[in-house]
Amino acid sequence: MIERGKFRSLTLINWNGFFARTFDLDELVTTLSGGNGAGKSTTMAAFVTALIPDLTLLHFRNTTEAGATSGSRDKGLHGKLKAGVCYSMLDTINSRHQRVVVGVRLQQVAGRDRKVDIKPFAIQGLPMSVQPTQLVTETLNERQARVLSLAELKDKLDEMEGVQFKQFNSITDYHSLMFDLGIIARRLRSASDRSKFYRLIEASLYGGISSAITRSLRDYLLPENSGVRKAFQDMEAALRENRLTLEAIRVTQSDRDLFKHLISEATDYVAADYMRHTNERRVHLDQALAFRRELYTSRKQLAAEQYKHVDMARELGEHNGAEGSLEADYQAASDHLNLVQTALRQQEKIERYEADLEELQIRLEEQNEVVAEAAEMQDENEARAEAAELEVDELKSQLADYQQALDVQQTRAIQYNQAISALARAKELCHLPDLTPESAAEWLDTFQAKEQEATEKLLSLEQKMSVAQTAHSQFEQAYQLVAAINGPLARSEAWDVARELLRDGVNQRHLAEQVQPLRMRLSELEQRLREQQEAERLLAEFCKRQGKNFDIDELEALHQELEARIASLSESVSSASEQRMALRQEQEQLQSRIQHLMQRAPVWLAAQNSLNQLSEQCGEEFTSSQEVTEYLQQLLEREREAIVERDEVGARKNAVDEEIERLSQPGGAEDQRLNALAERFGGVLLSEIYDDVSLEDAPYFSALYGPSRHAIVVPDLSQIAEQLEGLTDCPEDLYLIEGDPQSFDDSVFSVDELEKAVVVKIADRQWRYSRFPSLPIFGRAARENRIESLHAEREVLSERFATLSFDVQKTQRLHQAFSRFIGSHLSVAFEDDPEAEIRRLNGRRVELERALATHESDNQQQRLQFEQAKEGVSALNRLLPRLNLLADETLADRVDEIQERLDEAQEAARFVQQYGNQLAKLEPVVSVLQSDPEQFEQLKEDYAWSQQMQRDARQQAFALAEVVERRAHFSYSDSAEMLSGNSDLNEKLRQRLEQAEAERTRAREALRSHAAQLSQYSQVLASLKSSYDTKKELLNDLQRELQDIGVRADSGAEERARQRRDELHAQLSNNRSRRNQLEKALTFCEAEMENLTRKLRKLERDYHEMREQVVTAKAGWCAVMRMVKDNGVERRLHRRELAYLSADELRSMSDKALGALRLAVADNEHLRDVLRLSEDPKRPERKIQFFVAVYQHLRERIRQDIIRTDDPVEAIEQMEIELSRLTEELTSREQKLAISSRSVANIIRKTIQREQNRIRMLNQGLQSVSFGQVNSVRLNVNVRETHATLLDVLSEQQEQHQDLFNSNRLTFSEALAKLYQRLNPQIDMGQRTPQTIGEELLDYRNYLEMEVEVNRGSDGWLRAESGALSTGEAIGTGMSILVMVVQSWEDEARRLRGKDISPCRLLFLDEAARLDARSIATLFELCERLQMQLIIAAPENISPEKGTTYKLVRKVFQNTEHVHVVGLRGFAPQLPGTQTEDTPSEAS
């Protein structure tokens, strides 16, 4: 028999009035007696505080501050403590004889709220000899001791071997230890459980019928059917979870589309941008490299252009200089040609003028002769006319004078004066100052003789003049010719000069005859000289172009070498063309192949992605299509095997589910029909009677009853005999046992127990041997154990089934994936890697481009060499025929020599041309020059002088004649003499005047006619002279101009000058064309250089910008790559097939995905913000952050109970696999989990019946309890009418309400609540939810109404109420109920802890004086029968004959208050180990 645990003692340390007091507790009743304020309530408060250290519950109302409502106010504990560390400890010993000390350390907290700090602790393994006060106090001297702190207590206990000290931070842990060690009767899991326990202690402490306990008797007495309730809750939770999971599946199915859409669009959005940046980075790198290559190429090209520019500029300078000289030469040649042409024209004019002059000269000579003759005749006529005129004038004068003298006397003076004038004139003319009128006559004769002599001399001279004039004209003509040829010279030198001129003329004519041959020779030599100069120029240019000076002898060898080089270069160029064509053809083929591979690469990459996914899914590596098809066959075989194994596991799981369902039947009935038969027969299933059998006893009772363990126990078999007739709806074997279901035992069989077996003697001649089953299922504990093992097996099977189903689904998905792969990608998946081929071909293309560039460079050099060789050969072809010219070093000297000879010949020709006619004229008359006819001039002078002398003589004679004639006038003596003497003279004068006038008229006519003729002759002569002089002057001018021109105007000069001009013009044109070409080339070169310079600057800028962009992008890209790798999304984003799309296509793809994403994340603020931030094109890492955020968001939305991965992409794949399987499995589970309303009603009814039976058994123990007029106490349990109606409807009319129970939107609890509301519309449910109401309706305790009844006096059974009972009756009744509650708790907790522990039972009763002696005795009897300890507080001693009584007296000693305690043990026999402490404790 298991001994019940007991409280041994209560120790108070440093409490008010108790410094170190230990109260030994009696095994039954401990009485605390004393007056008011003695410390009874303090002692009980210390006990309750150690038992329930919860300040939220502790409330000692007899000392609590009146009217206080604040939770922070003192609840009566603060005033019971003294300052410092306080302890309250309970010393217990449990059923296992283990000493356990539990207690609390209390300490007042400073402040006006009067709070108390409580620390619970426990001590195990303490020796029995150690008293609790020794643990927590330290003796200082005989009268002083010190209280240890909790830390000191722990250190002290740590030093004691085998002693364990535990300090608790949680009251739940403290109570859990006390429950496990059997100190308290119930496991206090929560504050609600602690509150119930405290209310029970409080009710027992203050006595009476507690309204709180009465109202909640169901919670105290009716055990919570945790198994059934947990089963309902688990079922509902499973159903709820199942439905939530199904809903989650449906959500997940929608999420799958969302996942697909979001992942697809996010992947397109980010991967397109990622690959675009990757492509752009590669493009930028390629562009940077291309820029750098182009930069270097441009620099080289610019340097080449600069060198070329320098060469062309130098050549252009040379051509400009040459052009200046050529222009000067050409202009000189043109001018020379013009001069030659002018000279020729001048020469023609000169010749023409010379011919004209010769003709004019002849005419002039003839006209001179005519004019001279006419002049002579004119002179004669003038003289004759003058003489006649003079004579007429004289005669008229004389006649006038005479007439005047005759007419007027005064004329005499006039005549005298005239005579004087005539004398004076005669003196003057005759140079005779002494002339007198008288000598005038003499002198007249003299002078007339002189006149006659002069006339004769003049006539002789005229004759001489006519003779000498011919010789003189020839000499003058010859002299003029010599003078014209030689220039002015002395007349005496004319002969010698003329002879020299004639000899020189012969030489000059000989030289002049050589002009044309010399000119032709000179022209030929000049042509050769020009060709030599041209050859030298060509040689210089050739050497300059060849960059080397060559000798003339080397040119032929060089020509042959160049010819050979041209042949080899021509072959090289032709072969290079073929090679270039072959390279370009290969390059085009490579480009075409690369294009084809680039088109095939995305398809191949898609196939590789699919193949890699297949390889990852199946863990195999495939190298050929045959392996894929073989693995597909293996996959089909594996799928068949997995399906077979899954079906087997499913069948076993269904069997386990059926067994679990069978074992889960209420009452242990494996057949539902047994419950119906038991209810029909009014019996109870045997399994239900033995439902509480322990797990250890289950094999025994299972073997004991054998097949009849499913029997129905009925009160009377005879009453059901009639009901057995016609019974068909029952098991094949139905066992019926007669007996009282309330007090049934196993005495119906005679049993012999063997080792692990029993022998049941059914009759004298029938025994049954039954071994203990290895897996008993008799009794709830055995069934629960079996169900637990079955659940474990079911979990394993479910997991295995889920795994197999997953594998089957996965295999099927894999099979479908393989089928799709075979249909779509098998033809290309195992082809060679196009990207590797592209890389190889790109390498080859780069080699070809490099080879082409090298070939082009070589070919260009060869072409340049070929062109140079051709130019060299062309130049040599022009040079080689002129080698003899180049070798002729005397050509220039010969040209100079011929030029000099030609100059001499031309000079001679000009001399002959100029003076040839004069020499021809001179040659026949040159002999006249031998003698100079100098007398001709003298004759002319003599003739003129004689003519003048004749004229003078004639004038003198006339003057003298006039004087002589006027001699009379000198002596007028009288006028008569003068008149008479002059009348004859007058007549003579008149006659003479007439003759003279006639002579004068004749002379005038002759003079006039000769004058007109002479004038005509003179005019002709003048015109001839003028024409001659003009032409002579023009000829002289032309000759001077011709001399000024300084050119030789021969017949070939113009042709040579024109040819020279044309040659120079051709050279100038060639030079200009070359210069223009060079200028254009130079301009083009400068433009090219400028373009190259601009291009170079742009390239440098672009290169630096691109390089900076590449470097900047590299840093950003490194961050992007780091973020990609850190988050493991590189495989998702680096989609190689996108590398073959253009930037516009990728940007379009990203923009489309962005538009879709904006709609997809419109309801998600976080993703929307991240997406908005990711739209910044300058921050590509934000797109990665968005992608990671999407993945994180999707990871958070992955149902881990459905999908076992964190990768949303894999989650989609698993969704596809899991969803259909989970949907099917969960649907079937829901069908299996779904319980019928009839089953629920039966379970609740059976539970109610069982608890009613248990309450009846508890009532049997209360039947003998009596207090005062109360003869008996009982509990009455009834089913509420509303709930009974609910059970009836659930059992019999559930079909009418299937709309509630078949709804997938309602749980069973909610459907039950809806049904309850439907059945009881008058009841107000308040704010409670249907789920809460349904859970309450699933608790059978809510179906019961429980009340306490007492049998009091003559009133019979009455409801126990405080107003109907006396105080003592109420206290006794309440104590009885509390004892029943404690017993009920123990029965309920027996299954929760070891069977070898019987917990302590202890109750309190304060103010027990209100009970009479009979009631006290009843309490003592109740405590003894129930092995319960009781602590009573009363002012007086109560039953000192039993139990232990402590007398408490509060005293003041030396201003120190303490409680004096005296213990008295009762008269009853003492239990061993009980001691009474008589020495009071004093507070130090």
Swiss-Prot record:
Start-end of Basic and acidic residues biased regions: 1051-1065
Gene3D superfamilies for this protein: 1.10.287.1490, 1.20.58.850, 3.40.1140.10, Immunoglobulin FC, subunit C (1.20.5.420), MukB, hinge domain (3.30.70.3500)
A GO MF term: DNA binding
Protein location: Cytoplasm, Nucleoid
Binding site for ATP: G34, G35, N36, G37, A38, G39, K40, S41
BP-aspect Gene Ontology terms: cell division; chromosome condensation; chromosome segregation; DNA replication
UniProt keywords, alphabetically: ATP-binding, Cell cycle, Cell division, Chromosome partition, Coiled coil, Cytoplasm, DNA condensation, DNA-binding, Nucleotide-binding
Gene Ontology terms: cellular component: cytoplasm; nucleoid
Ranges in a coiled coil: 326-418, 444-472, 509-602, 835-923, 977-1116, 1209-1265
Domain notes: The hinge domain, which separates the large intramolecular coiled coil regions, allows the homodimerization, forming a V-shaped homodimer.
Function according to Swiss-Prot or TrEMBL: Plays a central role in chromosome condensation, segregation and cell cycle progression. Functions as a homodimer, which is essential for chromosome partition. Involved in negative DNA supercoiling in vivo, and by this means organize and compact chromosomes. May achieve or facilitate chromosome segregation by condensation DNA from both sides of a centrally located replisome during cell division.
Known partners and oligomeric status: Homodimerization via its hinge domain. Binds to DNA via its C-terminal region. Interacts, and probably forms a ternary complex, with MukE and MukF via its C-terminal region. The complex formation is stimulated by calcium or magnesium. Interacts with tubulin-related protein FtsZ.
Protein name: Chromosome partition protein MukB
Annotated source species: Salmonella dublin (strain CT_02021853)
Gene giving rise to this polypeptide: mukB
